[in-house]
Amino acid sequence: MQTNLLKPKIISVEALTANQAKVVMEPFERGYGHTLGNALRRVLLSSMVGYAPTEVAIAGVVHEYSTLDGVQEDVVNLLLNLKGIVFKLQSRDEVTINLRKEGPGVVTAKDIDLPHDVEIMNPDHVIAHLSAGGKLDMQIKVEKGRGYVPGNVRQYNDETTKIIGRIVLDASFSPVSRVSYAVESARVEQRTDLDRLVMTIETNGVLSPEEAIRQAASILVDQLVVFAALESSEVSGDLAPSRSSMVDPMLMRPVDDLELTVRSANCLKAENIYYIGDLIQRTENELLKTPNLGRKSLNEIKDVLAARGLSLGMKLESWPPANLEK
C-alpha cells in the first residue's frame, strides 16, 4: 500500500494582469488543497513586508478635523487619499518626503518630491483638488512594515513625533491586495481522489504575485520547521535543557538556505558567517565594512531576513550551540 504523501509536481503561474496572477499547484492528497491553500492565503494577507505613510504634517493644520482654504477636500479625505499611494523604498526602511503645490489644479502622487531611491507605483493617484489661491504644503513619513498597524497602538519615544500638528496614520503595509483560492479535482494515473490548488493573487505592484507566494511559503516553512525539530527526551535526574536545545533550529541552518546572490554569499563566508544565527548578530555597520559587500547586497540580506521574521543586530544568549559545526 502506498504510504508516502504526494507532493505537487506541476506548478504553473499565469499572469492575468501586470499585478495579478493565477498559480496552479497539483497534485495534493485529498484535503491538502484546503489545508495549504488557507494557510498560504492567511500568510499572504497578513505577513508580507511593504511600505506605507505613517505620519503627516500639513502646513496650517493642527488636527485631522481641520479644513484648508482653497482645498476641495477636508483633512480627513486628504489623509485617506494619502493612504492610497503605493510607495516602494529601495535602500532604506523609512523616509520623509515633501509635497508642495499651488492651485488651481489637481494634486497627484507624482507631485511629491522623491529621492532617487523612492518610487511611487501609482503616480496618477489623486490627492487633492486646489482652487485659485489654494496651496498644499505637507511632509509625509513613509516606513517599512508588515501587516496592518493602527495609529493608536503605535508607540513613540522620540519627542519630535509628539509636536502639535503631526498626524499619525493607520498604516496598511501589506503589498497583497486580494487572495482567493479554489480546490479542484485532480487525477494521477488511476487515482482520481486528489486535489488541485488554484490561487489568484493580486498585489499593489511593490511585489509580484509569484514572489509573494514564494515568500509566504518560506514563512510557513520557517515557522513549521520548529515542530519538525522536536525531540523526545528521556526522563533523567537533570531536566535542564541543553544549550543547543534552546536555540531556534532555523538559526542553525546555513546561510546558503537564504538563497542569496553568489556575491553576497561569498562575502559572508569570507567573514566566517556560515549560519543564519551568525548573520543576524551582525549589525549593518559591521556588514558594510565587509570587503565587496555594498549597500545593494546589504538590502538583499535585510529583505531575505525580514521575510523570515528576522533582522540584523539581534542578540542570542545561547549562541553558538555546543554541537554546531563550522
Curated annotation (Swiss-Prot):
The keyword Membrane does not apply. Keywords: DNA-directed RNA polymerase, Nucleotidyltransferase, Transcription, Transferase. It comes from the Bacteria. It catalyses: RNA(n) + a ribonucleoside 5'-triphosphate = RNA(n+1) + diphosphate. GO terms for molecular function: DNA binding; DNA-directed RNA polymerase activity; protein dimerization activity. Residues 1-231 are annotated as: Alpha N-terminal domain (alpha-NTD). The keyword Phosphoprotein does not apply. InterPro entries: DNA-dir_RNA_pol_insert, DNA-dir_RNA_pol_RpoA/D/Rpb3, DNA-dir_RpoA, RBP11-like, RNAP_asu_C, RNApol_insert_sf. Its EC number is 2.7.7.6. Pfam families: RNA_pol_A_bac (PF01000), RNA_pol_A_CTD (PF03118), RNA_pol_L (PF01193). One of its GO terms (cellular component) is DNA-directed RNA polymerase complex. SUPFAM superfamilies: C-terminal domain of RNA polymerase alpha subunit (SSF47789), Insert subdomain of RNA polymerase alpha subunit (SSF56553), RBP11-like subunits of RNA polymerase (SSF55257). GO terms for biological process: DNA-templated transcription. Residues 247-326 are annotated as: Alpha C-terminal domain (alpha-CTD). Gene3D superfamilies: 5' to 3' exonuclease, C-terminal subdomain, DNA-directed RNA polymerase, insert domain, RNA polymerase, RBP11-like subunit. The N-terminal domain is essential for RNAP assembly and basal transcription, whereas the C-terminal domain is involved in interaction with transcriptional regulators and with upstream promoter elements. Homodimer. The RNAP catalytic core consists of 2 alpha, 1 beta, 1 beta' and 1 omega subunit. When a sigma factor is associated with the core the holoenzyme is formed, which can initiate transcription. Belongs to the RNA polymerase alpha chain family. DNA-dependent RNA polymerase catalyzes the transcription of DNA into RNA using the four ribonucleoside triphosphates as substrates. HAMAP family: RNApol_bact_RpoA. This is DNA-directed RNA polymerase subunit alpha. It comes from Polynucleobacter asymbioticus (strain DSM 18221 / CIP 109841 / QLW-P1DMWA-1) (Polynucleobacter necessarius subsp. asymbioticus).
